[in-house]
């Protein structure tokens, strides 16, 4: 009997490890936090989270995935004039993103910083930053300064912490992974 129980335990552990190695994201962790606006679309079999703040410009964070445990995208969004550059000061570290090509290729009327393997260190730092100050430089040369603070920052950090706790980079859909190279071309990052 002990051998049978040991065998069942071993099989359960192997199945659990295989399931986890497959890169499955449990989006239901967001249901536990009533401050997080989790939208579930049973028709499209998808989930999404949007966190927005408006100071000098609309700034938001978005994450989207599928109900079967995949992540499609996560990123910061800045709406307004097309921006050539985004500088984000996280505590004492400056991250600079050249977003000029997004204006040409995507014509968003703003810009976005997408979570990719190249920008993962930025989003990990954002998940624990005490201060987040942002400067957008528009195509016309205007600087727009804003910050993410208070409950907005706490909500973004909660989502990022959950994403990284579940090894988000191994949970992306194939289409999501396919966009990484393009995203990195449209948002080259430097760190000072």
Question: Which residues fall in each region the model found?
Answer:
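A generic "folded-domain core" signal
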Residues: 21-192
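Positively charged n-region of N-terminal signal peptides that target proteins for export
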Residues: 1-4
């Amino acid at each position: 009997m002990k051998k049978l129980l040991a065998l069942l335990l071993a099989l359960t552990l192997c199945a659990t490890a295989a399931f986890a190695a497959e890169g499955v994201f449990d989006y239901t962790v967001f249901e536990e936090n009533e401050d997080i606006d989790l939208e579930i679309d049973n028709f499209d079999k998808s989930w999404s989270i949007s966190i927005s703040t408006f100071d000098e410009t609309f700034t938001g964070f978005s994450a989207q995935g599928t109900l079967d445990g995949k992540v499609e995208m996560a990123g910061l969004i800045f709406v307004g004039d097309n921006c050539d550059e985004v500088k984000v000061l996280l505590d004492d570290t400056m991250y600079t993103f050249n977003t000029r090509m997004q204006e040409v290729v995507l014509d968003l009327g703003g810009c976005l910083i997408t979570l990719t393997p190249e920008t993962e260190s930025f989003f990990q730092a954002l998940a624990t930053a005490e201060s987040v100050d942002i400067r957008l430089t528009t195509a016309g040369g205007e600087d727009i300064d804003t910050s993410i603070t208070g409950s907005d920052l706490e909500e973004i950090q909660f989502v990022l912490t959950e994403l990284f706790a579940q090894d988000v980079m191994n949970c992306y859909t194939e289409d999501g992974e396919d966009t990484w190279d393009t995203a990195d071309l449209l948002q080259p990052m430097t760190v000072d």
